[in-house]
Amino acid sequence: MTALQHVAVLMGGWSSEREVSLRSGAACAAALERKGYRVTRIDVQRDIATVLQNLKPDVALVMLHGKPGEDGTIQGVLETLGIPYSHSGVLSSSLAMRKDLAKTVMATAGVPVAEGLTLTRAEIAKAHVMAPPYVIKPVADGSSVGVFIVTEDQAHPPQELFRDDWPHGEELLVEKYIAGRELTCAVIKGEASDVIEIVPLLKFYDYEAKYSKGASKHVLPAPVLPFVYQEVRRLTLAAHGALGCRGVSRADFRYDDRIEGTGGLVCLEVNTQPGMTETSLVPELAGYAGVAFDELVQWMVEDASLDR
């Protein structure tokens, strides 16, 4: 890629993660402009195919979180229009977005995942479908949106499940709650990054903790035993490969350090479109490895292709 190329930064959209996407996109667009690229910022709406067809950018930097940018939809549009793009392709994006299906694929590849069930909202709302504590989460949302932790002292599932305006879809994933620490590792330039521990200053690492300054503490490198550290890195690459991810991805883990060896490690999910805001983990991990934010964004553009 040359500095004269025209990059369309795709952001916004209509998912529950719209605001985070706008922040990620704005940060990346500014970085590319500092590098000399011609940049067009696009707040993605339903007419995106027409907008791109008229604009004819050389490459698309996808900074969409949730649908339609993280589930394979926008990737299909870009493939059809012949516009090289960043991050993962159609199949891996749609697969990773469906947490239940992604877990099946990762487990087959030897990546440990949480015990869980995929059920309808009505089934889950009736009564406990497994012994508490357990976690209820949308099968295809990110940023911890719509996540509920059901504890032992709760006699019934969350009453929010009965809402007429429930926004998170009718299929939900119910998983056994995994006690322990939050660890995260990324794949950047084909290699596993260092490992970071997230210590929420709230009750758990929810949307507010992820995107509000001072709402969580990041410890880098994560203070775990060396063999655990390396196992997180190995599993991150294994999950990335099993799902067919490309470009940058991020794997999130729970680690119960009361269990001997690495038996307490569980992969919660792989994010094919990690956040790029001022509080996001991937820029922090890249920076720790000596890759500045602007260089990371430029690499994402240089890595763009139609072979995803």
UniProtKB/Swiss-Prot annotation:
It catalyses: 2 D-alanine + ATP = D-alanyl-D-alanine + ADP + phosphate + H(+). Binds 2 magnesium or manganese ions per subunit. PROSITE patterns: ATP_GRASP, DALA_DALA_LIGASE_1, DALA_DALA_LIGASE_2. Residues 103-302 form the ATP-grasp domain. Pfam families: Dala_Dala_lig_C, Dala_Dala_lig_N. One of its GO terms (cellular component) is cytoplasm. Belongs to the D-alanine--D-alanine ligase family. This is D-alanine--D-alanine ligase.
